[in-house]
């Protein structure tokens, strides 16, 4: 760990985690071009990557001490005064300030950006430092937008969108550790036709206009075999790489599979909802709490969409993969991902089983129709 702060126990000098280093570089670049941007943190200025900004622009970073609640209320005040605060915290410590996010920031639609470092499984940092609660909690905050980038490019893009949003709170979350290899999108889904497709023949067709909050990248797409169940794998944030690898395994098996990565996951993007409504199986993989997380939010959104549009083709089978509702033991991130079935092979197997179940249900429906 190296030298630590005697009060917080955090490293005095930030380790060169890939995600944190990219944030540190990008926030300096953004601040150079926008004098409204100011960094705020709670006794973790160096570990979260705000030190380079403080070194270059000392008056543009405020460390409020071990006071996350104050950091959020203070940032709301800065936003009301015309600034755009970027509050950088460890994800687990945002739990302390949920009331302030809800009542001081979101209620007033304050343009505050919250950057959550060490989101998801942190492993050897211990049970208290797993940043697994944020998405399940923040999904219930009206008007809030949350991004979960998959790599360096999408992290930079999400930060640019976040600091340009002045009428709502934005959150950008990423895990501890090295950046994964970049994944190039084949195409992007966009907000399109409102009616669900009969026969579930295609995931979704592109349309030319899409809000930044509705961006969904298609990472892998294989054509469906006749009569086979269509599988949609949704990789949330850094889990997109595992979802992509699982999609490759399913493709080798001859399954019809599409792998997507939504840049912003709260609220569920409209193109993702319509895509999920058009398939037989949806598997959502997230580095966070399963109960109430992104998979749960997407499932509810699909049900509402189908009810609103009178869909008659049946609901997709949902499988949610992530962190169970428990305090997580101290272990390596790799070991915990294996324990929770979050590796590519586990994801592929869960999708296969769900596809078998969907095929059986479809056969039963056909027999009843006769």
Regions found by a protein language model. Give the residues of each.
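Short beta-alpha junctions and helix-cap segments that line functional grooves
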Residues: 100, 158-159, 271
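Short beta->alpha connector loops at strand-helix junctions that form conserved
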Residues: 64-65, 89-90, 148-151, 285-287
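Conserved glycine-bearing catalytic or ligand-binding loops at nucleotide- and phosphate-handling centers
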Residues: 148-165
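Thiamine diphosphate
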Residues: 1-26, 32-55, 63, 69-71, ...
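Extended, hydrophobic alpha-helical segments in both membrane/secreted and soluble proteins
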Residues: 49, 61, 68-88, 97-101, ...
């Amino acid at each position: 760990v190296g030298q630590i702060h005697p009060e917080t126990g955090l490293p005095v000098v930030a380790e060169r985690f890939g995600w944190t280093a990219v944030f540190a570089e990008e926030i300096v670049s953004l601040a150079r071009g926008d004098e409204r941007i100011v960094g705020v943190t709670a006794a973790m200025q160096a570990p979260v990557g705000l030190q380079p900004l403080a070194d270059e622009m000392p008056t543009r970073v405020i460390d409020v001490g071990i006071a996350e609640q104050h950091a959020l209320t203070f940032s709301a005040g800065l936003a009301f005064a015309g600034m755009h605060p970027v509050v950088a915290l460890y994800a687990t410590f945002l739990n302390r300030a949920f009331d302030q996010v809800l009542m001081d920031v979101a209620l007033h639609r304050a343009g505050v950006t919250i950057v959550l470092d060490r989101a998801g499984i942190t492993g050897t940092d211990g049970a208290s430092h797993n940043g697994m609660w944020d998405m399940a909690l923040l999904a219930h905050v009206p008007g809030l937008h949350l991004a979960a980038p998959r790599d360096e490019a999408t992290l930079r893009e999400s930060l640019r969108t976040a600091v340009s949003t002045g009428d709502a709170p934005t959150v950008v979350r990423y895990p501890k550790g090295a950046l994964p290899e970049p994944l190039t999108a084949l195409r992007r889904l966009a907000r399109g036709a409102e009616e669900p497709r009969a026969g579930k023949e295609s995931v979704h067709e592109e349309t030319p206009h899409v809000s930044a909050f509705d961006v969904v990248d298609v990472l892998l797409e294989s054509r469906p075999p006749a009569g086979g169940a269509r599988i949609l794998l949704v990789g949330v944030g850094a889990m997109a790489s595992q979802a992509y690898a699982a999609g490759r395994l399913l493709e080798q098996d001859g399954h019809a599979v599409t792998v997507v990565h939504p840049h912003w996951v709260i609220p569920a993007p409209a193109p993702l909802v319509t895509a999920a409504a058009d398939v037989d199986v949806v598997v959502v993989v997230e580095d966070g709490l399963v109960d109430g997380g992104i998979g749960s939010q997407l499932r509810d959104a699909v049900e509402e969409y189908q009810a609103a549009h009178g869909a008659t083709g049946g609901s997709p089978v949902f499988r949610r993969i992530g962190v169970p509702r428990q305090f997580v033991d101290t272990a390596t991130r790799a070991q915990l991902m294996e324990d929770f079935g979050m590796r590519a092979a586990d994801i592929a197997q869960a999708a296969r089983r769900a596809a078998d179940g969907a095929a059986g249900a479809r056969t039963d429906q056909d027999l009843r129709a006769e």
